[in-house]
């Protein structure tokens, strides 16, 4: 597959934005990266923002290492050349030159916001096979409207590789379908720009605003909506169909395995994608639990590791709890999902967030004092955690709620605590 230069530039931009966001703890970088172009400088710190990524000497090596890992550049020996590149365009051109004639694999990291990310390498052959399988599910597609980052595996396949494959009649050709980036647009804006034959590539959190729109708006005929990175909630399913989407596909996938299954109705089991049929035993090592309902169908029963998917990102509640427990005013902290069914499904309702229960060091605090402590903690975690991993509510008590056997339990109105959310 010869990725168009413009596609590679999108991947580079989103990959660089994620790397710098996580490195600096500044999660506004993703927003400013929308203005990055081929002329955006790499190292000019005085112009950091839209005009420059503004890396220092250590970040420069970090960025080159991430690009080398993702695109498999070690085999091409261009590491030193990358370090000499002055602009984003310089870097993209060098990568494109070595990727264009031949490439073997792409290495992605898990979409976790907490804990150490895991890397997974996907061969060119497997990515091509996955694209061919998804094409058989789709009707005629004229354009892609992307609401997702291009560098995560779901975005890579559905907003980069699949458009290239459909538009080229195969991944060896040139060109590809037009991709409209609508990541930073409101729902009303991108809905209003849809044309017949479009395919929207999104995820549950982005579709969450649609129910309020569905009563007054209709999309053109023949438009498809695709969703992944978490369970599509019942309200979102209903809204998509009421808006007039011709086809809705919910994709189940994992960073370790790519796209695994799909369904076209909220009550349906997931059907294995064509490229996984006959190979389901290879899925046993995934972090998700399955209930097989047939040779090609399964239900998803949640993750084995207790992580929670929020707005497309995996969050480790234990890691968040450990961080907040380090604050000098906190004696104990417990973190849970605000949905009691968060571990009952593979994905989660699109409105799911984290809540925190805090046992302060100082006891006997007034409601006003606790409200002040909640503000302090919110401000303290903001630079240390990405939005998906930040608790949206704080409750306080003398000790963490536990069962008679000492196991942490969810808190409710029967527990003696103060809700200062």
Listing of model-derived features with the role each one plays in the protein:
Residues 136-173:
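Conserved AMP-binding loop of ANL adenylate-forming enzymes
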Residues 212-267:
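Gly/Ser/Thr-rich phosphate-binding loop
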Residues 126-145, 184-198, 212:
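Conserved ATP-dependent adenylate/AMP-binding module captured primarily in the ANL superfamily
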